[in-house]
């Protein structure tokens, strides 16, 4: 487990240096390990350059997104492959991307639950999925299926317009009995996406998702939900409010999803309203930056040394140096908010907006896992006088999530190929000193 983000003081984080006050007997003890669990609709993003005649041939609508059946997807894929039209094949899926990035950042294990084609040919899209996935991701619990995993075709016309064709294949065929209870005992979080419980009637995926939530609650593992898209929320906002209230600890969303969920156009106000249902909110707001909202114990609150910020809640970041906690674990819970503007004003050229939110969430998950890891290995540390959700403060997690988002925006793939640099360039070094 790498230290989350950068800091001058690392509190004898039990990786490189051990606390010299801990007895030799305890040092000889085997270090406790942890991991993050995620359930995903396993799919591959396939990019290809095509002409308008190709789009018409397959009955697609230029510039729009359409769901296609498996037979049409197979014909389309084979034609693209035979004519060497495919420019990129990336492993995709919101949770797959998030777990991959977590494993790259933390240099530690994550566990993916989902489906995988039992018959994999070299060069096929299932093969590409495995090739593009971090070796620190445990894929041993994937459920084999006879058909294809999901495919999302991004067909790029000569004028640059993107047309999407989505084939779900067998990606929603994950069964409840394929969710192993034993992996939840030492997990730091269970990560889900809203898409999992919104499938066709008869698909087993929603039942499998609820089984995982049941195990997470049994072992006191925080359940994290990423909203996915505003269209999922718009269909039935009240359903999602109830779902968050009943099952979710942490929610990650963008400003559009926040508005669909709460009715508030301002991301800070949306995050504040979401605290009625969950304990911690991560809200990305594009060029405006990133907000966090949550609770902390009143007696453990820490005042910021940074300028107080105006907003729909006056001086909302007053206690952003506090650490997030589950509301029910606090004797006197108080709300805490934090905000950060895009790192370095954002990349000079944004190469890919797909996955920046997943990147921000992977940084938050790393910090949550680091807290679990530190608490298990240095239980008598002053860091654990209260039961906190993260290792770092609201402010520090914002900084870390923001930095990871920047890295994803500046590259083509939503999956990081390497962790953050050990040292920033001299001009950016001050970012971590704030």
Which residues make up each language-model segment?
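Ribokinase/PfkB-type carbohydrate-kinase core domain
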Residues: 1-65, 86-90, 109, 115-347, ...
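Active-site gating loops and adjacent loop-to-helix segments of metal-dependent hydrolytic enzymes
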Residues: 56-82
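Hydrophobic alpha-helical packing residues
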Residues: 70-74, 212, 274, 405
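Glycine-/proline-rich flexible loop or hinge segments
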Residues: 75-86, 106-113
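Active-site alpha-helical elements of protease catalytic centers
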Residues: 89-111, 358-362
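Short glycine/serine- and small hydrophobic-enriched flexible loop segments
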Residues: 100-104, 366-370, 403, 407-410
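Short, threonine-centered small-residue motifs that mark membrane-proximal processing/anchoring sites
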Residues: 351-354
């Amino acid at each position: 487990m790498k230290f989350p983000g950068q800091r001058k003081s690392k509190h004898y984080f039990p990786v490189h240096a051990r606390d010299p006050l801990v007895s030799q007997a305890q040092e000889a003890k085997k270090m406790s390990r942890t991991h993050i669990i995620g359930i995903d609709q396993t799919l591959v993003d396939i990019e290809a350059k095509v002409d308008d005649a190709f789009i018409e041939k397959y009955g697609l609508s230029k510039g729009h997104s359409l769901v296609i059946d498996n037979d049409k997807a197979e014909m389309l894929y084979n034609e693209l492959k035979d004519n060497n039209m495919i420019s990129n094949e990336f492993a995709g899926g919101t949770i797959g991307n998030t777990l991959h990035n977590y494993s790259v950042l933390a240099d530690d294990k994550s566990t993916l639950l989902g489906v995988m084609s039992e018959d994999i040919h070299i060069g096929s899209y299932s093969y590409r999925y495995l090739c593009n996935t971090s070796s620190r991701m445990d894929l041993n619990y994937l459920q084999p299926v006879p058909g294809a995993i999901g495919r999302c075709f991004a067909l790029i016309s000569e004028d640059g317009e993107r047309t999407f064709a989505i084939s779900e294949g067998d990606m929603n065929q994950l069964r409840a009995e394929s969710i192993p209870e034993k992996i939840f005992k030492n997990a730091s979080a269970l990560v889900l996406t809203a898409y999992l419980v919104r499938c066709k009637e008869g698909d087993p995926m929603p039942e499998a998702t609820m089984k995982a939530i049941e195990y997470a609650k049994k072992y006191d593992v925080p359940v994290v939900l990423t909203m996915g898209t505003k269209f999922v929320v718009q269909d039935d906002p009240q359903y999602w409010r109830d779902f968050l209230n009943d099952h979710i600890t942490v929610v990650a969303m963008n400003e559009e999803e926040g508005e669909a969920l709460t009715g508030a156009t301002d991301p800070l106000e949306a995050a504040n309203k979401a605290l009625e249902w969950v304990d911690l909110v991560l809200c990305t707001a594009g060029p405006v930056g990133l907000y966090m909202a949550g609770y902390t114990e009143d007696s453990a609150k820490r005042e910021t040394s940074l300028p107080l910020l105006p907003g729909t809640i006056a001086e909302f970041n007053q206690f952003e140096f506090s650490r997030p906690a589950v509301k029910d674990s606090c004797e006197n819970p108080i709300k805490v908010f934090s905000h950060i503007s895009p790192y370095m004003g954002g990349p000079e050229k944004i190469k890919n907006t797909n996955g920046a939110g997943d990147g921000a969430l992977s940084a938050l998950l790393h910090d949550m896992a680091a807290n679990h890891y530190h608490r298990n290995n240095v239980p008598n540390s002053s860091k654990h006088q209260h039961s906190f959700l993260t290792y770092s403060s609201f402010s520090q997690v914002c900084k870390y999530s923001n930095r990871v988002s920047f890295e994803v925006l500046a590259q083509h793939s939503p999956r990081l190929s390497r962790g953050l640099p050990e040292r920033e360039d001299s001009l950016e070094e001050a970012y971590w000193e704030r």
